[in-house]
């Protein structure tokens, strides 16, 4: 928590996520002996706060969102193009620059579907340690580089350090039980329907339905949003636990090269889409970036862009990546 306030004081973008991410990553790599043996960040705690972000995003789904639907053929088409080209670029970097074997390079370079990529890659004989490392580093590099890059481009830090708020600070405490119930209900919905990234899209779908019907509108207090960022940032940083420094440094260099190539592709597509749709370039770039759904939604919220628009495209990116991965995996198995 303290690292979040320090990040805010020095003008760090998304300070309550990037501050804890930096400190927890430092502890996991430089001071691993300070952690309990076999320590893993509690995933149930992470899921609870992802559900809260899902509720926030779902509450932003209004009829106005569908007024942009005539642009969706172009934006979804751009995401489709991005997935194929980004995967090819990542594979080339991991295979030829990193020297990874073809199977590890293939599954490590997917621009989405983190858990599915790891599961299918392990079954196909990939180096699981390197595969997991590169997939988590992809998200961490995007989450770190994108807000910093946008801050430099816009000339001011994005997020709460820039004075932007992502929620109302004056939500009454009496609303908290309702928020908790809705979050639990959304988690159950995501599990039953097996939604992609269901821990967030389930609560998002529930909040969107309640918002569109006018039955209920969710206002999440700012302190709870800050807590969610702290938990998510710490969880990402703790992913470095157990990795040797040499392996991690080499993996980080490869991740920066791969993400740099993918984001460059995203910038080009965002500029082209801006000319065709009139949508802001920064919002389009966030929509195309190969980061985690939850983290990219937080970046969108920090820019006061509609996170529902961004999230819909990220869900499509993940579904498309996983479907393509499944088809190619079956083809590789038949060929092999």
PLM-predicted stretches and their roles:
Residues 18-19, 40-53, 73-78, 99-110, ...:
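Cytoplasmic-side transmembrane-helix entry/capping segments in multi-pass membrane proteins
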């Amino acid at each position: 928590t303290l690292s979040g306030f320090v990040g805010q004081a020095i003008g760090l973008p998304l300070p309550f996520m990037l501050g804890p991410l930096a400190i927890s990553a430092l502890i996991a790599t430089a001071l691993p002996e300070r952690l309990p043996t076999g320590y893993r960040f509690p995933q149930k705690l992470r899921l609870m706060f992802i559900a809260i972000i899902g509720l926030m995003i779902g509450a932003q789904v209004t009829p106005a969102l569908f007024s942009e639907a005539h642009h969706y053929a172009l934006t979804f088409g751009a995401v489709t193009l991005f997935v194929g080209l980004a995967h090819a670029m990542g594979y080339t970097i991991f295979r030829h620059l990193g020297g990874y074997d073809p199977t590890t390079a293939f599954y490590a370079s997917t621009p989405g579907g983190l858990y599915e990529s790891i599961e299918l890659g392990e079954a196909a004989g990939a180096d699981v340690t390197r595969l997991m490392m590169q997939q988590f580093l992809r998200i961490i590099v995007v989450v770190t580089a994108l807000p910093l890059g946008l801050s430099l481009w816009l000339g001011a830090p994005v997020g709460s350090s820039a004075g932007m708020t992502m929620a109302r600070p004056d939500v009454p405490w009496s609303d908290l039980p309702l928020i908790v119930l809705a979050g639990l209900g959304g988690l159950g919905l995501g599990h039953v329907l097996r939604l992609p990234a269901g821990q967030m899209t389930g609560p998002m779908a529930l909040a969107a339905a309640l918002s569109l019907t006018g039955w209920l509108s969710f206002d999440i207090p700012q302190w709870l949003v800050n807590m969610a960022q702290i938990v998510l940032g710490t969880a990402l940083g703790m992913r470095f636990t157990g990795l040797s420094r040499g392996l991690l440094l080499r993996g980080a260099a490869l991740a920066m090269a791969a993400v740099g190539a993918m984001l460059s592709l995203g910038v080009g597509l965002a500029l082209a889409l801006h000319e065709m749709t009139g949508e802001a370039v920064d919002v389009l770039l966030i929509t195309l970036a190969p980061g985690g759904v939850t983290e990219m939604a937080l970046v969108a919220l920090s820019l006061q862009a509609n996170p529902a628009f961004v999230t819909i495209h990220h869900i499509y990116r993940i579904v498309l990546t996983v479907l393509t991965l499944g088809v190619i995996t079956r083809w590789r198995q038949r060929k092999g």
